[in-house]
Every structure is written in structure tokens, then in C-alpha cells.
Amino acid sequence: MSEAIKTDVLIIGAGPCGLFAVFELGLLDMKVHLVDILDKIGGQCAELYPEKPIYDIPGIPLVTGQGLTEALLEQIKPFNPTFHLNEMVESIEKIGDPGFRVTTDAGQVFECKVVVVSAGGGSFQPKRPPVPGIEAYENISVFYAVRKMEQFRDKEILIVGGGDSALDWTLNLHPLAKRITLLHRRDEFRAAPHSVEQMRKLVADGTMDLKIGQVTALEGADGKLTGAQVKGSDNTTSTVSCDTMLPFFGLTMKLGPVANWGLHLENNLIPVETASFETNVPGIFAIGDINTYPGKLKLILSGFHEGALMAQKAHRYVYPDKRLVFQYTTSSSSLQKKLGVN
């Protein structure tokens, strides 16, 4: 077992909410380490939609998931957080008042005063369509997420699904692709009406195809797709020519070890009080999509707000004898000094 790393705060999850929490904690002189099961920083933003536009970040009309991640990393540079990627927290043990010993599946041990769970909905994996032999094509010509749009330039793409992800990527990839076919099991969609309207206009213009049915088999060799057999609503089978398939059937969310950390759970979410977003265990907080409370909105901006209030309470655990004086970055010379702006 590795020697324990001592830190003020350990954040579990390096998505946008976890990253902004570093900023709020750093302003209050708390040192932070972050652990994430993914191999990259940014959580779902980086893993699932790095190039997908986000429109509801205050003051930023449009930013991609990757762009938001990069901006947050730039913002927290002055606080020099340490990241531990490809590691999953397995256990949290109380060792003081306050104080916790946290152990990962890599054998790394942390000793900290505060734990912040910012793990989104837990670990996630795409739902795989029930198509025989699809595994042989995965990551070669079948993909469950778009990480680089340029990868799909001049491709003949079959997009499968009827939700927002399927419609969004149909519209976003349309200018790049050689041809796009959208396939859904029925001619009704669970996506934003504006997106559905745009898609139907492209179909009417003849620049893309819409088919109703389900994929029953794939055609190709050595992982390289040449087509997909589709069974229509009239039970007839046809072949859709494609060299790339993007199935968007949603995600399977798994809490994993979170369920064993002694935290109360409601429908796989962690209940918190809304003054500081603390859990039933003093010193353990939950922010972002992993938590629940009356009126909760699963928005990145909500997680930012939660992180700011969490940091105020965390300060009491890390510095129990130090009075916290609230300050503004616009007027506080000490905060500006921490940020390196004066």
C-alpha cells in the first residue's frame, strides 16, 4: 500500500463541478487532490461530448465540453491541484473529527479533513444495442460517443436513436459527413422540437435519410462496417449502406462503491441539506448530478453554486479556529494575490 497522501480536501470526480470546487476551495486556502475513474479530466463533458455545444453556462453563449474543461483548468491553475486519474475510490473510513482515510483501487491512500463527492451519476457506460456481433466493430466503425468530429468527415454514417443525442449529432455531423442516415424504431422523437424540425427539413431537402426500423445485423469484416440490415415497421428487411454507426441508446449509470461509503441514498442519489450540500456524514459533501434535494436541477451551473456554498462549510472543518471573512475577488487584494492578478 502506498504512503498516505495528506491533503485538506479530496474531491471524487474531476468533471466541471469538481473543477470549479477547486477554485472555491483554493480561494479559502484549502489544498485539493482529485480522483477520477476516467483517464482524462472533464468528466462526462470530456468523455461523452467534448465537441458538443453547451449553451447554458452563464456569460458564455456557447462552449464545447472540452472548451469548458480547458477554461476551468486555466482558472484553477493558481491553486495547483493534483489529479489521480484511472483510479476509483473504494472505501472511505472515518479517522478523526474531522478526518477521513480514503483508499482507491490502485492502493493509493489519502488522509483528509473533507471529502467532496462530485461523481456525476456515478460511473457510466453506453447501452449497447442488441445486435449480434457488434462488439467486433466497436471503436473501429461503431462508436458510442463523438470525441473528435473531424474523425467522421466524409463518412457514410448511420445514427441510431430518437433522443437529443441522436438528433444533435445528426445535425452537427451533417456538414462533415458524406451521407447521414438517421434510424429510429418509430417516427416520433424524444428530442427538442427545433432539432426534430431541422432534421425533417434536411430529409425533405434530400441531403440526409430517415428510416424507421431497427438494426438486426451488421455487414462487414475485420471490424470495418459496410452496411446494416434494418427490419422496418412492416417487417421487411433492407440494407442501409454505412461505414460508421453511432448508436445513442442512453447510458447505464452505476454507483459502484459509493453505495458502500455509509452515505444515505435515495434512488441512487445522495441526499444533502441545501445550506452547504453536506451529506448525513459530517465532513462529506456531495455536489453536482450525484446529489438530490427539493428543487434540484441537474445543470452545470447548479453544481457551481453548490461548490461555492460547500467551500464555506468545508473551511470550518479544515480551519476550525480560523474565522472566515467573506470577500469578493473584485475588491479583495488578498484574493487577487492568490489568483496572481496583482
Curated annotation (Swiss-Prot):
**Would I find NADP among this entry's keywords?**
yes
Keyword list, A-Z: FAD, Flavoprotein, NADP, Oxidoreductase
- Where are the annotated coiled coils located? none
Which InterPro entries does the record cross-reference, listed alphabetically?
Answer: FAD/NAD-bd_sf (IPR036188), FAD/NAD-binding_dom (IPR023753), Fd--NADP_Rdtase_type_2 (IPR022890), Ferredoxin-NADP_redctase_2 (IPR050097)
Kindly list the positions annotated as binding FAD: 17, 36, 44, 49, 89, 124, 289, 330
**GO molecular-function terms, A-Z:** ferredoxin-NADP+ reductase activity; flavin adenine dinucleotide binding; NADP binding
The record lists the catalysed reaction(s) as:
2 reduced [2Fe-2S]-[ferredoxin] + NADP(+) + H(+) = 2 oxidized [2Fe-2S]-[ferredoxin] + NADPH
- SUPFAM superfamilies the UniProt entry points to: FAD/NAD(P)-binding domain
Co-factor requirement: FAD
Q: What Enzyme Commission number does this protein have?
A: 1.18.1.2
Q: How is the cofactor bound?
A: Binds 1 FAD per subunit.
Q: Which Gene3D superfamilies match?
A: FAD/NAD(P)-binding domain (3.50.50.60)
Answer yes or no on keyword Transmembrane: no
Oligomer and partners: Homodimer.
HAMAP family in UniProt: FENR2 (MF_01685)
- PANTHER family in the record, alphabetically? THIOREDOXIN REDUCTASE 1-RELATED-RELATED
Homology family: Belongs to the ferredoxin--NADP reductase type 2 family.
Protein name (Swiss-Prot/TrEMBL): Ferredoxin--NADP reductase
**What organism is recorded for this protein?**
Nitrobacter winogradskyi (strain ATCC 25391 / DSM 10237 / CIP 104748 / NCIMB 11846 / Nb-255)
Q: What is the lineage of its organism?
A: Bacteria, Pseudomonadati, Pseudomonadota, Alphaproteobacteria, Hyphomicrobiales
